[in-house]
A protein has these predicted regions:
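Amphipathic alpha-helical polymerization modules
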Residues: 1-257
Length: 257
């Protein structure tokens, strides 16, 4: 009975994690280039249950009853890198990638440490010094480092990521792709960073100027999954309440027999 209580408890924890992921997806449904996440669950290893003190069998032999599952545990959260739809902005600072690859960004944390992060959010602008930056002020990287432009002159970006101004090629966007996206992890609101053993490869993405990639979150689908998760959570709650009532009866009344 106590094992059943524990099984319901692990179910609650699992559904809560799933709900947190779904809620975060919905919160980022309007975030440019956001990739939705999902949650997995795994069962604990089954264990053998034994019948003890059975006078019908030899007292020295425990009889197997079968297997007993100890509930579920949280598996891994994963990212769905499916490309989102494009929307037209007609703003030449807005860039979108069609195909595999990420914009490279120079990120500085609160401690002043500098590292390269990756994003599909191409909503860029110029800072006061004329550098191309993200909405958070992080520098967008080209093949030669930070990208500096003349704010008083128009510029263009071709499909290969070449940036030109005054009929002169300035630099090329540093678009990075990875051999295995399982070696990427979410960082902050809308960045990704490689983990150990991540390997880069040449990106095959096409750059579109004046467009932004929307998130790949399907709001209706996420809401349906939230309802399903909520029902599963309620079921586990009721199971715990049932076990609690049964244990209370066992402790208060069976002792009187």
């Amino acid at each position: 009975m106590v094992k059943g209580l524990y099984t319901a408890y692990t179910g609650l924890i699992n559904e809560q994690n799933r709900m947190d992921v779904l809620t975060n997806n919905l919160a980022n449904a309007d975030t440019n280039g956001y990739k939705k996440e999902g949650a997995t669950s795994q069962s604990f290893n089954d264990v053998l249950a034994y019948k003890i003190k059975d006078t019908s069998e030899s007292p020295n032999i425990a009889k197997k009853l079968g297997t007993m599952n100890l509930g579920v545990k949280i598996g891994e959260n994963y990212t769905d890198y499916t490309q989102g739809s494009f929307r037209v902005t007609n703003n030449h600072y807005d860039l979108a990638l069609s195909g595999n690859g990420f914009f490279s960004v120079q990120f500085t944390n609160k401690a002043g440490d500098i590292s390269t992060k990756y994003t599909r959010d191409g909503a860029f602008t110029l800072n006061k010094d004329g550098y191309l930056v993200t909405k958070d002020g992080d520098y967008v990287l080209g093949t030669n480092g930070r990208i500096k432009l003349d704010p008083l002159q128009d510029f263009s970006v071709d499909s290969l990521g070449n940036i030109s101004q005054n009929n002169r090629n300035i630099t090329k966007l540093k678009i990075t792709d990875f051999e295995d996206y399982n070696y990427l992890e979410h960082y902050g609101e809308n960045y990704y960073q490689p983990v150990e053993d991540a390997k880069t490869k040449e990106a095959d993405a096409t750059v579109y100027s004046g467009y932004l990639e929307a998130s790949n979150v399907q709001v209706v689908q996420e809401m349906v999954e939230m309802i399903s998760t909520s029902r599963a959570y309620e079921t586990n709650q009721k199971m715990i309440q049932t076990f609690d009532s049964t244990l209370q009866i066992a402790s208060s009344q069976l002792g009187k027999v």
